[in-house]
Amino acid sequence: MVAKGKKASADAVYAKKTTRSANPFDNSTAQSSKRGNPFDVHVNKEKFKILGRICKHDRGMPGVSRAKALQKRAQTLGQQFAVKHKTNRFKDNRIGKHLSGDQLTESVMNARYLAEKMSQVRSNQKAEKFNLNDDELLTHRGQTLEEIEQYRDERSDDEELDDEALDADFTAAAHFGGEGDSAQDRQAAIDEMIVEQKRRKNEIAKEKDEVYDLTEKLDANYKLLLPLVAKVTKDEQDAKPPPDAYDKLLKEMIFEPRGSVADKLINPDELAKQEAARLEKLENERLRRMRADGEEDEEASVAKPKHRSADDLDDGYFLAGEDDEGDDTLAYDLDGNLGTHLNGKKEAVLKGDENEDDDDKEGEEEEEEDSDEESDSEVDNLSDLKESESESEPEEAPKASKKKAKKSADTIPASLDTSIPFTIKMPKTYEDFTELLSKHATAQKAIIIERIIKCNHPKLEGVNRENVVKLYSFLLQYLKDLFEDASEQDIREHFQLLSKLMPYLYELTQLNPERMSNTLLEVIKEKYEEFRKNHKMYPSLDTLVYFKLVANLYSTSDFRHPVVTPCFIFIQHVLSRSRVRTRQEISMGLFLVTVVLEFVSQSKRLVPAVFNFLQGIVHMSIPKRDVEQLEITPPFERDGPLSKLLALPANTESTKLEPQQLQPTDLVTQTITPDFKVRALDTSLLLIKEALQLVEEHVGACYLAQPFLALLSRLPLESYPEHVHQHHKDATELAEKLAAQKMKPLAPAEKKPKALRLLEPRFEAVYDDKRRPKMSKAKEERAKLLHKIKREKKGAIREIRRDTSFVQMLRLKQTLQSDKERHEKVKRIYQEASVQQGELNELSRAKKKKKF
């Protein structure tokens, strides 16, 4: 129910809908300013309707656009045209107008004054060009020069004032008796005057001495004061800020020496061709010298003149060298004796034989000295692997004489052939390769390998590229044969050969990395299969040499490597499974530990087998009773004779041994000696220190260092020399330092806020009916840019034309306005003149009336 006197909501809505106003203009809406006049709209019709084309100029309002353009030009060009040639605005163009009062230095004031005078001269150049009456007052800091100048006559301190000696008081007292009651004697007055004069002279001399001393002191410190006096000026009173990094770098670049012009870099292909051509040329010369072909012809051609005329004076007769045998021309010799050439030749031959005998004796002595020096330097000179040997041979070969070659052939054994060819063909079989190397010494084997590589370089034309792969396989097999059955006498020589061949193995690896790596990897796989058959025995020595090759030829810091990673696993299996019972096995284990530490020197990885092996070596160096056991991990034994294999007996005196490293003979010797025990423990201590330094930054370094402390504390150092004590102290201190470190508590890793997913916009080419030629991307961009420039240029020309018409219209309006004002002035002048003429006529008529 609805309350009485109230209408329902439906009735109210119905009444509102049906209510209409009586005024017909109440429902009409006022025309807004945005709607515009429909007659101002201009429609641009298209001939064809094309799908996909968006036309931006289908309709427009030219009247509104024209009005806006005129309004914009009136606000810009109109205002500029209105104030043209008008100077009703003050502009401060003075120098240093932004500086405050403290910053206005004397140089700024002088520059401002000079600029003002120059502007005045330019503005009134014709009027004041020869004006000498310049009535301007010169000022300085607000004061005129007349106020500043006071015409003082200040005398210097050095000038003596003689007139002060006879002042008025002295004259009155000396000549007139003075004004005092007691009269002085004349002699007393003169004495007093002399004393006073001496006192003043002494004071002046003292002052001069002080000034002289100060001057000498300043002269002595002149060099210290010179930078301050020379650099500090009135403009630089304020302290300059220190030069920043950019200024320092700029000065370094200014005074940096310029690079000198270098030769053009040679292409590797051209370099290989040049090297092959050089070796071929040297080989041809060597063969020619060996056969002695063409030497007599060359000497005869040099000595014998090609042509002798009838007027020849024989000036070069005795300078031509050897002459023809049948030449018996009568001539004077150098001593002025008359004779034939045959007599002089016989004497020269006799003298030459004596000289040759002396030279042979001297040559024999020199060769004996050279052979001694070469034998001494073969062991020491191991670093120069490539350049010294390859370059010295070609230089020495041309200088060798026949007799010296014969003498050297007698002194050197017949099994070693010193004549190395410069061009060597690739051996077809491994037997030929070993036969080629067996004829030469260790130092010459590296030269042979170098020349084989250069003569069979893959970049040369007509060379089989498989030759370098075959040479690499031959070298690996040759190293295997050398080290597999090495003895104590030749093991050192084999390692020297390995160090000399290492650069050439690296060069071969770089020529074809994939093939060479696969070849070496197959050899290592074969060695690993042999090791798995009897994993309790250490592999042969050639396997260890292959590991050393891998360390020198490849990057061992990679996380995964096709050659290094298998070697890594192989070494860990050897160290953790093979038994340690002899001197050879201990030396091999320490050699493998050194190689592994070289592997992880950059990556600092953790290798548990290395730490276990080093703990085992220290464990075997501790003397133990039969019932005593120490915890150790296999392959080392807790008790028994092998658990104290490296322990020194109590009665052994080895404290005087000098520090030595492990020798190459240790790798092929089985018996254990006291000096080897000392060297093994000393090497182990050094390796423990190096291994702990590598894992120093690891989280669990404390757990790796704790087992070493218990073993190092049990070592009896009384029987060991001093250097072992020092190495034991260093290793113990480092282990205690790492064992004292505390591990950080585990904490969840900090998660970075997840970035919002960014979607790349997908651009779609808009189709239009315009056919364009196919162009590259760069040409297409250039064409678009040229088209845009053309459109902008047309628009700029159109705007300039409209601006010109607008300015012409303003000038026309200004001209019309001035003409209108002039016409009004002329009209007003005529009007005033006509009024004046009327009054004048009226006066003249009045005068005529008075006359009559």
From Swiss-Prot:
Compositionally biased region (Polar residues): 20-35
Q: Where is the composition biased (Basic and acidic residues)?
A: 344-353
- The protein's superkingdom reads Eukaryota
Query: Which InterPro entries does its entry note?
Result: Nop14
Q: A single GO molecular function, which one?
A: snoRNA binding
Q: What are the start and end residues of every segment in region (Disordered)?
A: 1-40, 288-324, 338-410
Identify the keywords attached in UniProt to this record, alphabetized.
Coiled coil, Nucleus, Ribosome biogenesis, rRNA processing
For biological process, the GO terms are: maturation of SSU-rRNA; ribosomal small subunit biogenesis; rRNA processing
| Disulfide bonding pattern of the chain | none
* Biased segments, Acidic residues type: 354-381
Q: What's the chief localization of this chain?
A: nucleus
| Subcellular localization(s) per the UniProt record | Nucleus, Nucleolus
Q: Name one GO cellular component term.
A: Noc4p-Nop14p complex
Coiled-coil segments on the chain, per record: 190-221, 774-851
What's the subunit arrangement here? Component of the ribosomal small subunit (SSU) processome.
Q: What does this protein do?
A: Involved in nucleolar processing of pre-18S ribosomal RNA. Has a role in the nuclear export of 40S pre-ribosomal subunit to the cytoplasm.
- Family to which the UniProt record says this protein belongs: Belongs to the NOP14 family.
The protein's name in its UniProt record: Nucleolar protein 14 homolog
